[in-house]
């Protein structure tokens, strides 16, 4: 079983060019599936039937996995089994037609603009603080995913045109604008970056000189949020959602926000760009000709 998995991981890395972060997620899900199978006496992928797939989902749910995590696990397994069909290791995909439990619409909380200002109001001259502020400014300015920020190299940022080139899901490249404050923060970081003795072209490096890992970026964001007195837990997803919400509040151009976020499906953007009812009411009162009070 492990031999087939390793070939699949090589395929994802070389042929599909998935990021290390995404590849790690695939490994995590398929390792959990493999452990469940071996614990129940299944030693080959040829023994996996639709009933076995349903059993995996049921056991995963018993173990405490929520709907979104179950959907991710099923998706990873289904794609791997489809690969085995193409490789003629299986005749049919036993996960075809099986659905994960229906997910409710999850509306992530956003950070309001006042809190964003508080978050980024730090002019420390410490090199690590300069780096962390540049990461936060860039992520909020361009709505980057954690994996996209992690994968940035020096040549991905064009200082003249104020653009950043990112590799999104499915190796889709997109060019994004960078705001003036984010650009200034990146320039400040580039002036001190060499003090970290960087070992490669990664834009953001650790104190040891290597590319910052996704987990290290998350940890630095958590620490920064606490240090700046943020009233909510800070994570990359929340910052990206805040970017989307604030962009929609300012422009109401859902298609433009979809392009900036790199979503292939507009429905995904609609979930990200949830607007609170008070904002909608304010916009309505100001814009609708029959909503204004008579003077």
From Swiss-Prot:
TM segment ranges: none
Keywords: Cell cycle, Cell division, Chromosome partition, Cytoplasm, DNA integration, DNA recombination, DNA-binding
Pfam families: Phage_int_SAM_1, Phage_integrase
UniProt domain Core-binding (CB): residue ranges: 1-85
Record InterPro entries: CB, DNA_brk_join_enz, Integrase-like_cat_sf, Integrase_catalytic, Integrase_recombinase_N, Integrase_SAM-like_N, Recomb_XerC, Tyrosine_recombinase_XerC/XerD
GO biological process, any: cell division
Compartments, as annotated in UniProt: Cytoplasm
Molecular function per GO: DNA binding; tyrosine-based site-specific recombinase activity
Recorded GO CC terms: cytoplasm
Active site feature: 145, 169, 237, 240, 263, 272 (o-(3'-phospho-dna)-tyrosine intermediate)
Annotated Tyr recombinase domain residues: 106-285
UniProt xrefs under HAMAP family: Recomb_XerC_XerD
Family label: Belongs to the 'phage' integrase family. XerC subfamily.
Quaternary structure annotation from Swiss-Prot or TrEMBL: Forms a cyclic heterotetrameric complex composed of two molecules of XerC and two molecules of XerD.
Physiological role: Site-specific tyrosine recombinase, which acts by catalyzing the cutting and rejoining of the recombining DNA molecules. The XerC-XerD complex is essential to convert dimers of the bacterial chromosome into monomers to permit their segregation at cell division. It also contributes to the segregational stability of plasmids.
Record PANTHER family: PHAGE INTEGRASE-RELATED, TYROSINE RECOMBINASE XERC
The name this protein goes by in its record: Tyrosine recombinase XerC
């Amino acid at each position: 079983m492990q031999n087939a998995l390793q070939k699949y991981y090589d395929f994802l890395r070389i042929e599909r060019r998935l990021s290390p972060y995404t590849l790690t997620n695939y490994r995590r899900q398929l390792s959990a599936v493999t452990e469940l199978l071996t614990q129940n006496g299944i030693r080959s992928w040829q023994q996996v039937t639709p009933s076995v797939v349903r059993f995996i989902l049921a056991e995963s749910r018993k173990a405490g996995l929520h709907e979104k995590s179950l959907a991710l696990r099923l998706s990873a397994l289904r794609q791997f089994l489809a690969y085995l069909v193409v490789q003629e290791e299986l005749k049919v995909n036993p996960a075809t037609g099986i659905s994960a439990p229906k997910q409710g619409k999850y509306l992530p909380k956003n950070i309001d603009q006042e809190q964003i200002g508080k978050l980024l109001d730090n002019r420390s001259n410490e090199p690590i603080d300069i780096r962390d502020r540049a990461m936060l400014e860039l992520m909020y300015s361009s709505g980057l995913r954690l994996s996209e920020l992690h994968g940035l190299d020096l040549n991905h940022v064009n200082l003249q045109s104020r653009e950043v080139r990112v590799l999104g899901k499915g190796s889709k490249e997109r060019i994004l604008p960078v705001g003036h404050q984010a650009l200034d923060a990146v320039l400040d970081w580039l002036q001190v970056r060499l003090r970290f003795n960087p070992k490669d072209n990664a834009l953001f490096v650790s104190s040891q000189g290597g590319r910052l890992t996704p987990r290290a970026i998350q940890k630095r964001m958590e620490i920064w949020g606490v240090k700046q007195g943020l009233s909510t837990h800070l994570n990359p997803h929340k910052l990206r959602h805040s970017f989307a919400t604030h962009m929609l509040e300012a422009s109401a151009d859902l298609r433009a926000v979809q392009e900036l976020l790199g979503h292939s499906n507009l429905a995904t953007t609609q979930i990200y760009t949830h607007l609170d009812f008070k904002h909608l009411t304010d916009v309505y009162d100001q814009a609708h000709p029959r909503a204004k009070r008579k003077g």
